[in-house]
Amino acid sequence: MANIKSAKKRAIQAEKARKHNASRRSMTRTFIKKVVAAIASGDKAVAQAAFAAAQPILDRMATKGLIHKNKAARHKSRLSAQIVAMQ
């Protein structure tokens, strides 16, 4: 455990940020899973709606630095391709 006051403060701040980031990361994964589930169900309209909801979340998390911008782009590209390929 830290002994210096500033180190104690940074430890508290780091823990607070870790919890916040974990929550945001979980939310992001949930949105992606909803799109994947909609694609698996075969309903294109539902998949498109879920993708439309997930897209700004991925962009926001990339902007905030929670995930890399290329990772967000990769998720969006792959999900979009799967939706386009649906019958």
Swiss-Prot record:
Xref: InterPro entries: Ribosomal_bS20, Ribosomal_bS20_sf
The keyword Nucleus is assigned to this record: no
Keywords: Ribonucleoprotein, Ribosomal protein, RNA-binding, rRNA-binding
Region (Disordered): 1-26
UniProt keyword Signal, yes or no: no
One GO term describing the cellular component: cytosol
GO BP term, example: translation
Residues spanning the membrane: none
GO terms assigned for molecular function: small ribosomal subunit rRNA binding; structural constituent of ribosome
Job of this protein: Binds directly to 16S ribosomal RNA.
Similarity comment: Belongs to the bacterial ribosomal protein bS20 family.
Protein name in the entry: Small ribosomal subunit protein bS20
Species in which this protein is naturally found: Tolumonas auensis (strain DSM 9187 / NBRC 110442 / TA 4)
Lineage, uppermost ranks: Bacteria, Pseudomonadati, Pseudomonadota, Gammaproteobacteria, Aeromonadales
Gene: rpsT
